[in-house]
């Protein structure tokens, strides 16, 4: 089969059969718009420089060692550490006691115990340690009252005795028996 040459004639296949005529002003406006769009293909002017500056600033901020350039004075002679006085230690014991009494977790666990709930071994151990520490601190600060024996009971009164009977018993006591 022989080859057929393409032609630009309006009757040829693929080419429009009618010709559009535009007036001069439309063509000029379109041309200017195309030219302007062609000029603005790339990035905005100066964007290369401003982006690079920002990146350099960020990189410099990340790389800079915070220890360099410190204005803090460095002592050349090491001074010996003085021990805390008894009053300072007492103050710190008071602070520790205050912290333990205000411990939210300990308070919640104590509330659970009072409600009759059984705690796990770890939580029970934690509560016991904290309560022991509170007791030691209170004893150290002199806030702990000596415990009285709860098992001690007053001797049972045999019947009702009046003052005359008690006075008679007192008079009958022989104090010579108690001399050593």
UniProtKB/Swiss-Prot annotation:
Bias type Basic and acidic residues, positions: 23-32, 50-68, 80-90
Gene Ontology MF, one: GTPase activator activity
Keyword Transmembrane helix belongs to the record: no
Record GO biological process: ribosome biogenesis
UniProt keyword annotation of Cytoplasm present: no
Biased composition annotated in UniProt, kind: Acidic residues: 165-180
Region (Disordered): 1-90, 145-180
Biased composition (Basic residues): 33-43
Keywords: GTPase activation, Ribosome biogenesis
Subunit composition and interactions: Interacts with Der.
Described function: A GTPase-activating protein (GAP) that modifies Der/EngA GTPase function. May play a role in ribosome biogenesis.
Family: Belongs to the YihI family.
Protein name per the record: Der GTPase-activating protein YihI
Lineage: Bacteria, Pseudomonadati, Pseudomonadota, Gammaproteobacteria, Vibrionales
